[in-house]
Regions:
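Glycine-rich phosphate/pyrophosphate-binding loops
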Residues: 128-134, 145, 150-153, 337-340
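RNA/tRNA-interacting regions in translation and RNA-turnover enzymes
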Residues: 42, 114, 125, 129, ...
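Basic, low-complexity terminal or inter-domain segments flanking catalytic cores
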Residues: 42, 78, 82, 100, ...
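Phosphate-backbone binding and catalysis cores of DNA-processing enzymes
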Residues: 1-101, 206-261, 266
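Core structural elements
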Residues: 1-8, 25, 53-57, 104-116, ...
Length: 450
């Protein structure tokens, strides 16, 4: 990591401006952001339409969505096509063709790792990755609890494992059975799939004592500490509870040659959702009218509702989404996600607006230099492979000097080549509203460590 940073950062100072940095992980993260920006800029939206029919059953209105014809799904790509379909349907009788009742399972979550904690805290609490780690560190190091003294409320916060100790398993089992009953205790625990990239040096992030419920410590914790502890506590307890089960009701309604769909559901057994709903939980809205339909139901047509849409470009990365993408591609480690994002934001390579990360002109310039002169280093596959090699060094399987011998000569050549061939890039300084007393021009903003 030092080789990459110490070798390339001075080059960025020389070719762009002082105060910049490159790094084995941060430069790949920046490239991921720039690649997404390019996808967004190159995106060409396409038009499509959907259509609903508002029907009435026993004086109660409900909505069904256009699906297609008897052969299968039909995509509506323009208003002219939509109008033809409506013309063919308008005099048809709407009738129930098929009804399917069933159930659907929503699996209990697995305990937090560093990355999933950062992602969920970003989505649910609006915390940055750095704020999440700072508060988690406080909870880990210890807080004053009345009658208990200073105790660490959570386990170690830098981990990629979902493993839980036998002692904690026994404690949470006793808690769930005592507070919610045997029916809520999971009979089978699902853990994260094993991976060669998982180090498994530490347990999952969980409360050190599950009997210390969020309500018990709320009055003794600052607001942000309480909110994160509550998230961790609920996630862990929920991970040892049964799955939630939805009762589902799906109906196909025919109109001439065309088919409409309607569905509704309700929670049959709440399971883990009794205490925990994450930011991705769907909202269940039960439509009792749809649930009461049968094949003999007489339906009355009320109106069509037409909606024009355009396909959307890929979304900008949020901190949570970037952490997830880095983890999926094997870039970085639990200890590096937050510092990496903090660095590229602090260097003004990206800005953050309403959770979204946007690449700046400076970030694009740095990324272009890295892609042009150091394409190997900002390659995601190379970086992921290097993580594996470093793990092997830690495990004593490879001598660290061997990796250095294989890597450094190529890096040295790339730096020398870039020094000779790359042109200097001019990036305009960001002006402030302050006027210089000596020359009368606007002062420029300079970013430093403080």
């Amino acid at each position: 990591d030092r080789m990459v940073g110490y070798s390339i950062s001075p080059l960025l100072w020389m070719k762009i401006k002082r105060g910049l940095s490159a790094g084995r992980v941060q430069s790949v993260a920046l490239r991921m952001l720039c690649d997404r920006e390019e996808e967004i800029n190159a995106f060409i939206p396409k038009e499509y339409w959907d259509m609903d029919a508002v029907l009435k059953y026993k004086n109660k209105e409900f909505t069904v969505s256009f699906y297609g014809d008897k052969k299968g799904k039909v995509e509506i790509t323009g208003k002219e096509q939509l109008d033809k379909i409506i013309e063919q349907i308008k005099d048809s009788k709407f009738s129930v063709n098929d009804i399917k009742k069933g159930n659907r399972t929503r699996k209990a979550p697995i305990p937090f790792t560093t990355s999933t904690m950062q992602q969920e805290a970003s989505k649910a609490l609006n915390f940055s990755t750095q704020k999440t780690m700072r508060i988690a560190q406080q909870l880990y190091e210890g807080v004053e609890i009345k009658g208990r003294g200073s105790i660490g409320l959570i386990t170690y916060l830098r981990t990629d494992s979902t493993r839980v100790s036998e002692t904690a398993e026994a404690q949470v089992k006793e808690f769930i059975e005592g507070n919610y009953g045997d029916d809520y205790m999971a009979t089978e625990i699902v853990s994260k799939k094993s991976s060669k990239k998982i180090q498994d040096a530490h347990e999952a992030i969980r409360p050190t004592d599950v009997s210390l419920t969020p309500d018990m410590v709320k009055a003794q914790l600052p607001r942000d500490q309480f909110r994160l502890y509550q998230l961790i506590w609920k996630r862990f307890v929920a991970s040892r509870m049964k799955n939630a089960v939805y009762d589902t009701f799906n109906v196909k309604i025919g109109a001439g040659e065309y088919v409409f769909n309607a569905s509704t559901s309700k929670i049959g057994f709440d399971g883990f959702m009794k205490i925990y709903t994450d930011s991705d939980n769907e909202k269940v809205v039960t439509n009792n009218t749809i649930a009461k339909l049968d094949k003999d139901s007489e339906l009355e047509f009320v109106k069509f509702e037409e909606n024009q849409h355009f396909t959307q470009p890929p979304a900008h990365f949020t901190e949570a989404a970037l952490v997830k993408a880095m983890e999926e591609q094997g870039i970085g480690r639990p200890s590096t996600y937050a510092p990496t994002i903090g660095t590229i934001v602090g260097r003004r390579y990206v800005t953050k607006e309403k959770k979204n990360l946007y690449v700046t002109e400076l970030g694009e310039a740095v990324n272009n230099v890295m892609k042009t002169a150091f394409s190997v280093i900002v390659d995601t596959e190379f970086t992921a492979n290097m993580e594996s090699l470093l793990d092997s060094v830690e495990e004593g399987k490879i001598e660290w000097k061997t990796i250095i011998r294989n890597f450094y000569p190529d890096l040295e050549l790339m730096v020398k080549d870039a020094e000779q061939k790359l042109e200097k890039i001019q990036i305009a300084d960001e002006e402030s509203d302050e006027i210089c007393e000596e020359c009368g021009r606007r002062m420029v903003i300079k970013y430093g460590p403080h």
